[in-house]
Amino acid sequence: MTLGYLGSLNDLSLIVVIGRSNYKKSSESLDALVKALHASGHSVCWFENRQTQTAKLLEDKFERLWGSRVSKFCKHNFLIGNLLRKTIKIFVLLAHPTRWGYFLTVFKNSNQRIANDLRKFLRHFPARRIYLFSHSAGGIVSSLAEAEDSVTKLVCFGYPFKHPDQDEEPSRTAHLKKMIKPFLIIQGDQDEYGSAQDSKRYKLSSSISVVPIQADHGYDNLSVSEYQKCLELLEKSLTLP
């Protein structure tokens, strides 16, 4: 389930990156921060869950077999073309029984299942100090995996306290009041999933600190000053006992 790594996977300390549920919405600024941490001497590994792996498999097979033809059709018939795209992907998925669990992600919250996969993933490494670096839904997943012995600290950019188009979902926040390990949440003042000020509505453990920055939920194209602020926060968090 690893997407890639920088440095050695045999180091006694390791940063594990857990991204957004939508792998297409990555952040160049956060990628740059991760690379900067590696440049300062930290080994880094990316975690890729089964849901993301399956989504990439479907997208790859679709694009190779039908992508160009459907894309041309979609230009003139967007709604029908989009439905056709999803239907084709379903048939591709049916040909891969080991991936059928992907269907479940449509009907129920999959964060706990992904967190269980993350905990199993972490046990493959000899590292005694693992730092979880996450973005958005990756923050929910990493916080649910906090109890893993090797996990030392957590950091999340844009914890998704509340989906902007949905009612409150306790599964996103109820466990946060019970967290024990240091959890740094860096929250944008324009984050539609909740700002640092909005986070005060929830019961958070004393081990959680929420720091505001100027950003939206994408945390991309950070200004030079905000980027430097984030890098200093991360480096300080990693060096403190």
Q: Where would I find each of the regions flagged by the language model?
A:
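Acidic catalytic loop of the alpha/beta-hydrolase fold
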Residues: N22-K24, H163, D189-G194, H217-G218
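Short beta-strand/loop motif that positions the catalytic acidic residue
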Residues: K178-I180, I185-Q187, D191
